[in-house]
Design a protein with these regions (language model features):
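HhH-family (HhH-GPD) DNA N-glycosylase catalytic core used in base-excision repair
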Residues: 1-297
Length: 297
C-alpha cells in the first residue's frame, strides 16, 4: 500500500539535539529493520497508535526544530518525540573522563527507543546471540507474518506484531519466521503476558515491575531483559551484560577491558547511567547516517 504525502508539521526540541546520532542504531542494519530506518537525513517509523498502524517520517530542520510528516496524529507528535526519540532527556554528566569526552564529542545524542517495553522484549528475544543485521532480517520476517506492510520513501515497512497476535499464535507458527523453537515459545509467552492493555501501560510506566515476570519465562535471561529495558523504554541504567558489540566498543577506549567479565566490572563505575554509556560507546564505534563508521554491527 502506498501512502499519500500528508502535510508536514513541526515539533520543537531543546538543543543540543542531533537526530542522526540519536537514531543511528536504526541505520546500523542498513535498511533491514522492519519498522524503522534512518537514511538520507530522515528517520522513518511505523507502529501502532490508538490500535491503528501509523507512520512518521522525521527530519531535523535546525537545532530546535523537527519536521514531521505521516499518518500519526499531530496531537501525539510531542509525546511520540519524547517516547521514541528521547527528545526530553539529554546526556547526563559523567565522572568517567572517557565517557565525558564522548559526551562532548556527541552532544546531541538522545535515548532513542521503541517507546514500548513489549516491543523491546520482542526485539531482544529475536536478537539473542546474533548480529544486528541477522536480527533485523529475522524480525522483519516476524512482522511480515502478522501484518500488511506500508510503502514509504522507496521501501516497504511492517509494524511490530501486537501482543494479542502473538498470544493467539502457536509456537510452531512463530517458528516459521526463522526463530528457534525456544524463542518462538518465549515470544508467545510474552504476547500472553502483555495482552492486557492495562498491563502494558503499567509496565511501560514502571518497567522494572515487569522484570520478575519476564525472568520467569523460559528463554529470557538477563541480557534479554536489560536489552529490552534499554531499547524498549530507554531505561537510563540498563546494562546488556555479556553484550559482544559493547565489548568491542569498550575495548577501543578502555585497554583494561579484555573480556566480558572485565566489561561488567567496568560498567559498575558507570552507574546509574550504564545505558547512556553503552549508547555513547556504540555510536562512537558504529557511526551514524552521514558519518563514516569505524565498525560494523
Amino acid at each position: 500500500m502506498t501512502n499519500p504525502q500528508p502535510p508536514s508539521r513541526r515539533v520543537a526540541v531543546s538543543p543540543p539535539f542531533d537526530l542522526a546520532k540519536t537514531v543511528a542504531p536504526a541505520s546500523w542494519a542498513r535498511g533491514r529493520w522492519p519498522n524503522v530506518d534512518a537514511r538520507r537525513g530522515a528517520f522513518v517509523w511505523v507502529g501502532w497508535e490508538a490500535n491503528q498502524v501509523v507512520w512518521r517520517s522525521v527530519r531535523q530542520i535546525d537545532a530546535r526544530t523537527l519536521e514531521i510528516i505521516g499518518s500519526g496524529s499531530s496531537e501525539r507528535d510531542v509525546h511520540w518525540a519524547s517516547a521514541v526519540l528521547g527528545a526530553s532527556a539529554a546526556i547526563p554528566v559523567f565522572d568517567d573522563p572517557i565517557l565525558a569526552a564522548l559526551a562532548r564529542k556527541h552532544p546531541g545524542l538522545r535515548a532513542w527507543s521503541a517507546g514500548s517495553l513489549f516491543e523491546g522484549v520482542v526485539s531482544s528475544i529475536v536478537g539473542q546471540s546474533i548480529s544486528v543485521a541477522a536480527a533485523a532480517t529475522t524480525e522483519r520476517r516476524l512482522c511480515e507474518r502478522f501484518n500488511d506492510g506500508l510503502h514509504i520513501d522507496g521501501r516497504q515497512f511492517w509494524p511490530p506484531p501486537r501482543p494479542e497476535q502473538l498470544a493467539s499464535s502457536s509456537a510452531a507458527f512463530v517458528r516459521e519466521t526463522g526463530v528457534t523453537t525456544k524463542r518462538a515459545e518465549a515470544l508467545v509467552a510474552v504476547g500472553t503476558l502483555f495482552a492486557s492493555e492495562p498491563t502494558r501501560a503499567a509496565f511501560d510506566t514502571d518497567p522494572v515491575a515487569a522484570v520478575q515476570q519476564l525472568a520467569s519465562i523460559s528463554g529470557i535471561g538477563p541480557w534479554t531483559i536489560q536489552s529490552a529495558l534499554l531499547w524498549g523504554v530507554a531505561a537510563a541504567d540498563a546494562h546488556p551484560t555479556r553484550d559482544v558489540a559493547l565489548l568491542r566498543a569498550a575495548r577501543v577506549h578502555y585497554p583494561v577491558v579484555s573480556d566480558l567479565k572485565d566489561l561488567d566490572r567496568l560498567a559498575e563505575q558507570w552507574k546509574p547511567y550504564r545505558a547512556w554509556a553503552a549508547r555513547l560507546l556504540w555510536l562512537d564505534l558504529f557511526g551514524y547516517d552521514g558519518a563514516n563508521a569505524t565498525g560494523d554491527a
